[in-house]
Curated annotation (Swiss-Prot):
Protein name per UniProt: tRNA dimethylallyltransferase 2
PANTHER family the record matches: TRNA DIMETHYLALLYLTRANSFERASE
Protein family according to the UniProt entry: Belongs to the IPP transferase family.
InterPro entries to which the protein is assigned, alphabetical: Dimethylallyltransferase, IPT, P-loop_NTPase
Role of this protein: Catalyzes the transfer of a dimethylallyl group onto the adenine at position 37 in tRNAs that read codons beginning with uridine, leading to the formation of N6-(dimethylallyl)adenosine (i(6)A).
Gene, per the UniProt record: miaA2
NCBIfam families, A to Z: miaA (TIGR00174)
Gene Ontology MF terms: ATP binding; tRNA dimethylallyltransferase activity
Amino acid sequence: MPDYDLITILGPTASGKTPFAAALAHELNTEIISADSRQIYRGMDLGTGKDLADYTVDGHPIPYHLIDIADPGYKYNVFEYQRDFLISYESIKQKGCLPVLCGGTGMYLESVLKGYKLMPVPENPELRARLANHSLEELTEILKQYKTLHNSTDVDTVKRAIRAIEIEEYYAVHPVPEREFPKLNSLIIGVDIDRELRREKITRRLKQRLDEGMVDEVRRLTEQGISPDDLIYYGLEYKFLTLYVIGKLTYEEMFTELETAIHQFAKRQMTWFRGMERRGFTIHWVSAELPMEEKIAFVIEKLRGN
């Protein structure tokens, strides 16, 4: 039987990975570590698809980590994620449990599964001024020139692209100090969802979250003093809803552009996961359409080495 340190459940948005991970954690009597770059923020719930009800299975709450750990407006980064992951990972292991890592932020997943050596990167005002007038497309092209941790998966606003370039520039001239990060042997399960079904679920989920008050959530965040620029930085829902709230888009424009952006995001997530396979990760894909019991049985078989 392979000696795994953890189980990773990954997949694009709307693939059902969170209820799958929760059901698996319930079966194995363990806890979940989230790998979602936006669900770490408190009060950003509907816009990040933070379905906390998914973490209750048959009336039993499943303990989860790295959700609701930072205030809106804060620029949390992958260096901090590595640090916080390790604290959560070690606390779960000390209980004698096999942690379940679950999420769709490829850079977060890969940073801990591969143990990238990272360090905090200060702001570079001169570089920011130089890049300020570039479009997102131009910045994405600049970013492609680096041998980089980043791809365009989460770089969907000008500010995020500039920050990604800032990090790459800093790493180019500052050698990364040796920092111990444990080599983790993870069983990696990917949730494979048919493209048309994924698109249908994305649209349905978007309409549902809007009905549940996603616009009000963004208004509430701005009323709490979070600047529109900071919300736009988080991309996707927060970018387009903020543009609607401040009057830059009509409701119809917001919906159409946001729907398209989420579809594109899911496609980029799958591109990242396929890239992980090319970079040496073994991902065991399971159909999103299988009944939950069959998905769990699939993982148990893989844990046994079958």
